[in-house]
């Protein structure tokens, strides 16, 4: 008699939160087709690796994960290994040749066909590749299996990127920027709120470009004004806001709307005008400094995060010194520093005056030492203040301590708050008095639930 046991699927999603949303859509589609989802790869009949290929380290992490999980086909129940996302979109032929243990490759525009593709695979032993144009735009009618904790989720408001930064391969992998329809986003946010989500993290390659490809005048501000009206949503956080797209209207909305976190992630990449010009960034040093001054003036409690690149081709010691001085002066609450990754197919890859890996690493260390000191000082300034904190469970070190995040901390990238006194349930938002701090984390006591 034919077995009716459901096929089990496990997903490993690598890279950014935007990639995670793609993975969640694939899982939702498979769950709708009655596949059973498991977080244990050892139990899985089908394993999907959703990859990133943005920089060298991300590519290596993806390859390592693929090779590791390929072993499951030898020592476990896995019979189908799928590689999806940016890596196959970029390196289809090379991967198909070098990784015969992979059964299916799926690009960034074809993942919504995951169930159909698996059905096609059941009729052949051949390796299959589905790498089309990256033109898909997710909408709220597709099922999405939220893999984040129940109280927060990412809301991806657009696909692709139309910026042409000289170091970045994303436009080739994801296509031009396409805004999702306003009503579709509101509908998805309402669905998330109905499931208990309290925190929306707004993401795309550049959230300030939202609506620029629409003809009805829709903007990011238009969307935010709708989202704040949704019952149950208490925090709305803005990630990946390009500096040249931050309008006075957006600043005023962040300042005045209680549901919008006093938090802004602005990828600046550098401060030296010669480097910014080589990077093909649209903002110059003066514009960046004026924007930061305005943000600090209009929203004194704003937590600012940025990302910077060191070792870009042509970056001189003078350029790097300017960058160090800028970090000292700007006093970012959070800072990510990346060594420039020479990516084939980008204009920067063929630029002269490439910086050595040794110099890149040294510059990275110097900037991170500066930021650790500044972050410690910024956190010390919060001692004695009261912050809104979402409780996320027990500390990994001891069940005597709860942990959470303040509205000044984004998921996964910004540090945590350790709670030494008071009780609350996971997912509660509480008022917490800060009593101590470290370089990147805060410590405090619950005052009241909100």
Swiss-Prot record:
Protein's GO biological process: tRNA modification
Location of the Radical SAM core domain: 147-377
Cofactor note: Binds 2 [4Fe-4S] clusters. One cluster is coordinated with 3 cysteines and an exchangeable S-adenosyl-L-methionine.
CDD domains: Radical_SAM (cd01335)
Record bears the keyword Ribosomal protein: no
Keywords assigned by UniProt, alphabetized: 4Fe-4S, Cytoplasm, Iron, Iron-sulfur, Metal-binding, S-adenosyl-L-methionine, Transferase
Reported cofactor(s): [4Fe-4S] cluster
EC number of this enzyme: 2.8.4.4
Regions that span the bilayer: none
TRAM domain segment(s): 380-448
Domain MTTase N-terminal: 7-123
Class of enzymatic activity (EC top level): transferase
GO molecular function annotation: 4 iron, 4 sulfur cluster binding; aspartic acid methylthiotransferase activity; metal ion binding; protein methylthiotransferase activity
Amino acids binding [4Fe-4S] cluster 1: 16, 52, 86
SUPFAM superfamilies given in the database record: Radical SAM enzymes
Superkingdom: Bacteria
Cellular component GO terms held in the UniProt record: cytosol
Function, in words: Catalyzes the methylthiolation of an aspartic acid residue of ribosomal protein uS12.
Alphabetical list of NCBIfam families matching this protein: 30S ribosomal protein S12 methylthiotransferase RimO, MiaB/RimO family radical SAM methylthiotransferase
Name by which UniProt lists this protein: Ribosomal protein uS12 methylthiotransferase RimO
Organism listed in the record: Pelobacter propionicus (strain DSM 2379 / NBRC 103807 / OttBd1)
Gene it is expressed from: rimO
